[in-house]
Amino acid sequence: MQQDMHNGGTGNTISNLSSALRQVNLGNSNTTTDQSNIAIDFNQQQLMEEVNQNSMNAFNIQQQHQQQQENVQKQQEQQQQQLQQQQQQQQQQQQQQQQQQQQQQQLQQQQQLQQHHHHQQRQQHPNNNVQAGTSQQQMLFQGANSIDSSRITKFFQNQPMEGYTLFSHRSAPNGFKVAIVLSELNMHYNTIFLDFNLGEHRAPEFVAINPNARVPALIDHNMDNLSIWESGAIILHVVNKYYRETGTPLLWSDNLADQAQINAWLFFQTSGHAPMIGQALHFRYFHSQKVKSAVDRYTDEVRRVYGVVEMALAERREALIMDLDSENAAAYSAGTTPLSQSRFFDYPVWLVGDKITVADLSFVPWNNVVDRIGINIKVEFPEVYKWTKHMMRRPAVIKALRGE
């Protein structure tokens, strides 16, 4: 019995030991699996670290590349700035050189003008001794302050009985403007070109007929020596008198509406066209200092004035073409130009009506000097150029501009 119990205890012990060993083996098996998982996790971690490292390297390379591009761009910008600065410096140097050349030209022109005036003085006053060392500018100044009115006084002491006497100056466009009208009307007139260097324009006898002491001035000897000053007033007096005496509105009109338009253009020329060109010439050649803003301002204003005239003449030409070539008027109005109309491009057109008037002729002398302020009317204002060319071909205009 005891022996059986002993044997049974032994079997239980063995059974428990086997179970324990089995559990140990199972535990070892689980432990092996965990270690395998740990190895896999470690490998993945290494792989991730390598990926991260590669990403960092790529990012660093990208940053370096971007930095290089920025550096290249900065260098290009610096080079461009340097180039712009060099160009600006070159432009400034060129402008300075141009200004110096213009100043030299102005000085030469002033010297030539002074020499011319001095030469005239010596010819007209050979016995007038000038002290040594006196500059030409001082002599010109003295001549401007002194008045030699002997020639003017002699004229007024023995005036003509008929015709007209025009007081003008060799370089006065407004004087030639009046001469052109007198010549076109075939009126008998004599011209006295005043010598400003002698102060003839300030002679008491001349100031009596023109209190402004400028040219032109006109004496109508047929009307009890009536004196008229200001070019526009002189022109209107002459054309109206001619119309009343002959009944022919030559250079004028018998239509009141056209007369108003002629007056408008005549006043536009005397108040806007002539003064702007005169000021542009003054600041470009004769002003004591170079004032670019003044030169530009008056030159631009002259261009604006010519733009007004150009538009008016272009409208007159369009009306002429549509009237003379009625068959193609619709095509021309639509913006096309048939070959049949090309022959009309050189036809003369006028500011008022279908004939030349004093409104047109008043522009001629000033149009002849506008190139001296850098305006090429042939290129910039083709209608003005053709208009001026037609007037310059007229025999009366040629005669007047020659001072005959």
UniProtKB/Swiss-Prot annotation:
<comment type="subunit">
    <text>Homodimer.</text>
</comment>
<dbReference type="Pfam" id="PF02798">
    <property type="entry name" value="GST_N"/>
</dbReference>
<feature type="domain" description="GST N-terminal">
    <location>
        <begin position="162"/>
        <end position="246"/>
    </location>
</feature>
<dbReference type="Pfam" id="PF00043">
    <property type="entry name" value="GST_C"/>
</dbReference>
<comment type="similarity">
    <text>Belongs to the GST superfamily.</text>
</comment>
<dbReference type="InterPro" id="IPR017298">
    <property type="entry name" value="Ure2"/>
</dbReference>
<comment type="function">
    <text>Plays an important role in the cellular response to the nitrogen source. URE2 gene plays a major part in the repression of GLN1 and GDH2 genes by glutamine, and is required for the inactivation of glutamine synthetase. URE2 gene product may catalytically inactivate GLN3 in response to an increase in the intracellular concentration of glutamine.</text>
</comment>
<dbReference type="GO" id="GO:0042128">
    <property type="term" value="P:nitrate assimilation"/>
</dbReference>
<dbReference type="InterPro" id="IPR040079">
    <property type="entry name" value="Glutathione_S-Trfase"/>
</dbReference>
<dbReference type="InterPro" id="IPR036249">
    <property type="entry name" value="Thioredoxin-like_sf"/>
</dbReference>
<keyword id="KW-0534">Nitrate assimilation</keyword>
<dbReference type="GO" id="GO:0003714">
    <property type="term" value="F:transcription corepressor activity"/>
</dbReference>
<dbReference type="InterPro" id="IPR004045">
    <property type="entry name" value="Glutathione_S-Trfase_N"/>
</dbReference>
<dbReference type="InterPro" id="IPR004046">
    <property type="entry name" value="GST_C"/>
</dbReference>
<dbReference type="GO" id="GO:0006808">
    <property type="term" value="P:regulation of nitrogen utilization"/>
</dbReference>
<protein>
    <recommendedName>
        <fullName>Protein URE2</fullName>
    </recommendedName>
</protein>
<dbReference type="InterPro" id="IPR036282">
    <property type="entry name" value="Glutathione-S-Trfase_C_sf"/>
</dbReference>
<feature type="region of interest" description="Disordered">
    <location>
        <begin position="110"/>
        <end position="134"/>
    </location>
</feature>
<feature type="domain" description="GST C-terminal">
    <location>
        <begin position="255"/>
        <end position="404"/>
    </location>
</feature>
<dbReference type="InterPro" id="IPR010987">
    <property type="entry name" value="Glutathione-S-Trfase_C-like"/>
</dbReference>
